[in-house]
Regions:
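Conserved acidic segment of CheY-like receiver
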Residues: 2-22, 57
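Conserved SAM-binding loop
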Residues: 6, 37, 86-87
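Short, well-ordered amphipathic alpha-helices
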Residues: 15-25, 44-45, 72, 120
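A generic structural motif
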Residues: 25-35, 81-82
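Conserved Asp/Asn-Gly motif in the active-site loop of CheY-like receiver
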Residues: 35-43
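CheY-like receiver
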Residues: 46-129
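C-terminal output/effector regions of signal-responsive regulators
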Residues: 135-139
Length: 139
């Protein structure tokens, strides 16, 4: 299962990006996709602390309280390995996104072709990581 967390403080952006993500899920019948939507970094962070992480994080950068960059850094400090995709109106923070080991940095507005391609790349990367891991059974 591919779990995707969308976090954006603007309702209109949550709605439009959320619709794109739902279209992505519908266009990928070979993948089970579960989307969770958050209006603040703190809400997402609280959910991750209580219930665990997500496969992919689609994060706005400029948000009140805790920026998307700072949220990404905190997720990494908590050892969450999900792919972080920043989606924002400003290229100003692109270099800062390296601190969170971002998978990609996209500019708003983003079209479905670009977003779907990046999501496919992230999902493929996660599949490769899972396949490369080794389980050792002990007594």
């Amino acid at each position: 299962m591919l779990t995707i967390a969308l976090c954006d403080d603007e309702a209109e952006q949550r709605s439009s990006i959320g619709a794109l993500l739902q279209n992505y899920a519908a266009a990928r019948p070979d993948r089970t996709v579960k989307l969770s939507v958050f209006s603040s970094s703190w809400d997402l962070l609280s959910t991750v602390e209580e219930a665990g992480g997500f496969s992919i994080y689609v994060l706005d950068v400029v948000m009140p309280g805790l920026s998307g960059i700072d949220l990404g850094v905190r997720l990494r400090e908590m050892n969450h390995r999900g792919a972080i995709i920043y989606l924002t109106i400003s290229s100003e923070f692109a270099v800062d996104s390296y601190a969170a080991r971002a998978f990609h940095y996209l500019m708003k507005p983003v079209g479905p072709d670009t977003l779907f391609q990046v999501l496919d790349q992230a999902a493929d990367h996660l599949d490769q990581e899972r396949a490369a891991s080794i389980t050792v059974k002990t007594r």
